[in-house]
């Protein structure tokens, strides 16, 4: 419950660790001791700017609406979100126009994992218990 209360306060884009993603124990932003963004840690880079799992970020409703309005005004300045497996998060976050260093980092500055990706949990349980 605490996790969702934190997400509710997201103004622009928030990020947080997600457990058991893509063969790794965690997918998370990596921060320094002062809470400043250093890089993303994820099992798959793929040349993405935003190396983050879909379950590892939230967008504030007001920010989303503001960016959607801008998208409708000036479509030429936005990345068209064509489907490409593994790049959905990247395209979406590029259009939100918030660089990773400006993200709101939740879960005690990304030190605690409060969410696991259920797709991968199902995969792991199938492998280990069948």
Model-derived regions: residue spans:
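Intrinsic disorder/low-complexity detector
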Residues: 34-36, 92, 119
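Catalytic donor-sugar/metal-binding loop of nucleotide-sugar-dependent glycosyltransferases
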Residues: 90-114, 121-124
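Conserved catalytic core of nucleotide-sugar-dependent glycosyltransferases
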Residues: 1-86, 102, 125-129
């Amino acid at each position: 419950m605490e996790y969702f209360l934190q997400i509710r306060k997201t103004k622009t884009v928030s990020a947080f660790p997600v457990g058991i993603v893509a063969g790794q124990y965690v997918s998370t932003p990596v921060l320094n001791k002062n809470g400043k963004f250093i890089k993303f840690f994820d099992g798959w880079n793929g040349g993405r700017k935003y190396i983050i799992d879909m379950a590892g970020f939230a967008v504030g409703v007001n920010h989303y609406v503001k960016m959607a309005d801008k998208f409708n005004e000036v479509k030429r300045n936005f990345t068209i979100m064509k489907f490409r497996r593994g790049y959905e998060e990247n395209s979406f976050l590029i259009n939100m126009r918030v660089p990773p260093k400006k993200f709101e980092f939740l879960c005690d500055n990304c030190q605690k994992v409060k969410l696991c990706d259920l797709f991968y949990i199902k995969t792991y349980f199938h492998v280990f218990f069948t």
